[in-house]
């Protein structure tokens, strides 16, 4: 009876002997690769590849969502430059109304400018551009640009008491801060 060297417990096993349980002995020739080790390495490589694939898919999905969000913001705020350019025109209309109200013979001019201003403001509002109130509100550096401070007894400290130029928002984004005068406590320099 011939015997072969078998990998396993290191001993010799007769060729016709029966194996017990789930122990499996595989003959390995010197210089021949161990297929179980090779299979284990390939399974690990497969796991890593699947993990990389899942990460890349998640990254692609996140990029797609970010691009969609940026696109919708771009559409919503596409007119921002136009709105900024129109604001000085709006300011001039308001100034014309302010100065012409003192003239008695300019009634029809005042009414025409007032109607133009109202139509202009309505058009801006349709696109989400609206002025915000500042006078009487607390000074907020996110929405107001203080050009002066003034001692006033009628208002609490750091309250907007006068507006030189209105502030505007485009949807929920600040388009232009309001230029304001802010109250200060008596005796502050």
Curated annotation (Swiss-Prot):
Where in or outside the cell is it found?
Answer: Cytoplasm
InterPro entries referenced in this protein's UniProt entry, alphabetically: GrpE, GrpE_coiled_coil, GrpE_head
Function description: Participates actively in the response to hyperosmotic and heat shock by preventing the aggregation of stress-denatured proteins, in association with DnaK and GrpE. It is the nucleotide exchange factor for DnaK and may function as a thermosensor. Unfolded proteins bind initially to DnaJ; upon interaction with the DnaJ-bound protein, DnaK hydrolyzes its bound ATP, resulting in the formation of a stable complex. GrpE releases ADP from DnaK; ATP binding to DnaK triggers the release of the substrate protein, thus completing the reaction cycle.
GO MF terms on file? Answer: adenyl-nucleotide exchange factor activity; protein homodimerization activity; protein-folding chaperone binding; unfolded protein binding
Which keywords, in A-to-Z order, does the entry hold? Chaperone, Cytoplasm, Stress response
SUPFAM superfamilies named among the record's database cross-references: Coiled-coil domain of nucleotide exchange factor GrpE (SSF58014), Head domain of nucleotide exchange factor GrpE (SSF51064)
GO biological processes: protein folding
Which Gene Ontology cellular component terms are annotated? Answer: cytoplasm
Q: Which domain of life is it from?
A: Bacteria
Q: Where is this region: Disordered?
A: 1-31
**Family label:** Belongs to the GrpE family.
The primary site where this protein sits is cytoplasm
How does this protein assemble? Homodimer.
Organism the protein comes from: Syntrophobacter fumaroxidans (strain DSM 10017 / MPOB)
The record's annotation in PANTHER family points to: GRPE PROTEIN, GRPE PROTEIN HOMOLOG, MITOCHONDRIAL
Which CDD domains does the record match to this protein? GrpE
- Kindly give the PROSITE patterns that the UniProt entry links to this protein: GRPE
The protein in question is named Protein GrpE
